[in-house]
A protein has these predicted regions:
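Short, charged, surface-exposed loops that flank catalytic or proteolytic processing sites
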Residues: 131-137
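Hydrophobic h-region of N-terminal signal peptides that target proteins for export
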Residues: 10-19
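Positively charged n-region of N-terminal signal peptides that target proteins for export
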Residues: 2-6
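A short catalytic or substrate-binding loop motif that flags glycine-/basic-rich loops and adjacent residues
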Residues: 17-18, 151-152, 347-353
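A contiguous strand-loop segment
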Residues: 21-121, 141-296
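Short, well-ordered beta-strand elements within core beta-sheets of diverse protein domains
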Residues: 125-131
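Substrate-recognition/cap regions that form aromatic- and gly/pro-loop-enriched pockets
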Residues: 323-356
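Mid-to-C-terminal functional-domain signal that highlights helix-capping/loop sites
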Residues: 288, 292, 298, 302-308, ...
Length: 356
C-alpha cells in the first residue's frame, strides 16, 4: 500500500434541516506523505449510514442505466450505460478518484421544479467515479452528462481528486427554462489547502488558465441573461452571481471554512468580518485556497474535522449555551425565535448529528 500515492478519503458524514456538510481538500505537496486528502462530513442523524458498492463491469451496446434520485429515491429516467465501468466503493474508485460534495443551494429559481429526465448530484458523483480514471476526466464526465441530460439538484460544490490533483467543481442548474447547468472547476495548487461548507466558494477565476480552470461556455452569458451580472468578463464571480451571500451563508457556512484555514495558516483574523455575517458585501473575500504553514498529516486533518471554533470569536465552549461544563454541542434547531426575538447557535465543523 503506497501511502505516498494514496488518495486518502477520510470520513463521510449530511444534515436535513440546516446546512450540513464540510469538505477539506489538501494538495499533495501540502501533505506530509505526498497524498491528496479529502474530508467529507455530512450531518444527518444516520440518513447516509451506508456505503454503496458498484462492481466493475462490461456492458453490451444498448444497455441502459436507471437514474434514481439519491435523496428522494424518485426515478428520474434512464441514460445509456458506458461500455465499461470501474469498481466503486463509497466515494472512491479503483483508480483512486474520489468525489465528495456540499450543497450550497443558490438561487431558488434555478432549482429543478420537475426534475424528471435529469441527473441528481448523488447519481452524478457515482457516474463520475464509474467512468473516470482521473479527476479531470471525472469533471468532464459529470459536466458532459448534465449538458446532455439535464441537472436535477440544487447548487453543489464537488471535491474531485485523484492521487495527483484536487479540484473544486461548482454547479447549478438553469431552472425550468433551459436544460443543463452552469459550472466552474478550479484546481487547488499542490502546495495549498481548500475547503467548502454549503456555500459557493468560487468567486473570480482566471478565464485564460486552461490548465487549472474549466468552466461552462455559457456560465457568464447565462448569468447576464438572468440579470445576475453586468460587469466585464474578468470581473465575474460565480458565487456572487449564483449564490449571493446572506447571514446564514457566511456565519453558518463560510465560518467553518475560515476555522479550518485558521488551523493551518496565519493571517485569518482579517477575514472575520467576511464570515461573521454582519458585513455582507463590504468585507474582503476569503480566498478559495491558502498555503499552510506546515505540511499536514492525516492526523492533522482528522483533528481539524473535530473543530468547534475553539479559541476563536465563535467558540461554542464559551457562550451562554455551553453550560457549566463548557460543552460545544447544541440541540437542534440551528435557529429559533422566542418572544419575538430571533436566536441562533454557532454551526461548527464537528457536530453531534454526524452520520458517518
Amino acid at each position: 500500500w503506497q501511502m505516498n500515492r494514496l488518495l486518502a478519503l477520510l470520513a463521510v458524514l449530511f444534515a436535513l434541516a440546516a446546512p450540513a456538510c464540510t469538505n477539506l481538500l489538501v494538495g499533495k505537496k501540502a501533505s506530509k506523505n505526498g497524498a491528496c486528502f479529502i474530508t467529507y462530513s455530512a450531518d444527518s442523524y444516520g440518513m447516509y449510514g451506508r456505503m454503496l458498492h458498484y462492481p466493475a463491469g462490461k456492458h453490451a451496446p444498448g444497455t441502459m442505466r436507471k437514474i434514481v434520485d439519491g435523496d428522494t429515491h424518485k426515478p428520474l429516467g434512464e441514460i445509456p450505460e458506458a461500455p465499461y465501468t470501474y469498481n466503486v466503493v463509497g466515494n472512491i474508485n479503483e483508480h483512486q478518484v474520489a468525489i465528495t460534495e456540499t450543497t450550497f443551494g443558490g438561487r431558488e429559481e434555478l432549482w429543478p421544479k420537475n426534475p424528471v429526465g435529469g441527473i441528481d448530484y448523488v447519481s452524478l458523483m457515482a457516474l463520475g467515479l464509474q467512468r473516470a480514471k482521473t479527476a479531470r476526466e471525472a469533471i468532464r464526465v459529470m459536466t458532459d452528462l448534465v449538458a446532455r441530460y439535464g441537472y436535477a439538484s440544487e447548487g453543489e460544490s464537488f471535491s474531485v481528486a485523484d492521487p495527483n490533483e484536487a479540484w473544486i467543481l461548482e454547479m447549478i442548474g438553469k431552472g425550468d427554462s433551459a436544460k443543463g447547468a452552469v459550472w466552474v472547476a478550479v484546481r487547488i495548487p499542490d502546495d495549498c489547502i481548500s475547503a467548502h461548507a454549503n456555500q459557493s466558494r468560487i468567486h473570480r477565476f482566471n478565464l485564460k488558465d486552461k490548465k487549472n480552470v474549466m468552466y461552462a461556455r455559457d456560465v457568464i452569458s447565462f448569468a447576464r441573461s438572468k440579470g445576475y451580472f453586468k460587469g466585464r468578463d474578468d470581473e465575474f464571480s460565480f458565487s456572487d452571481a449564483f449564490a449571493p451571500a446572506d447571514f446564514s451563508s457566511q456565519r453558518f457556512c463560510e465560518a467553518r471554512v475560515w476555522s479550518l484555514f485558521n488551523h493551518f495558516t496565519t493571517g485569518m483574523d482579517k477575514y472575520v468580518p467576511f464570515v461573521d455575517g454582519k458585513h455582507i458585501g463590504t468585507s474582503e473575500v476569503m480566498p478559495l485556497y491558502v498555503k499552510p504553514t506546515q505540511l499536514l498529516s492525516l492526523e492533522d486533518v482528522m483533528s481539524a474535522m473535530r473543530d468547534h471554533y475553539e479559541n476563536t470569536p465563535f467558540d461554542g465552549t464559551k457562550d451562554a449555551g455551553s453550560g457549566v461544563w463548557g460543552a460545544p454541542y447544541r440541540p437542534s434547531p440551528l435557529t429559533w425565535e422566542h418572544e419575538g426575538k430571533k436566536y441562533f447557535n454557532e454551526r461548527p465543523v464537528s457536530t453531534h448529528q454526524a452520520s458517518f
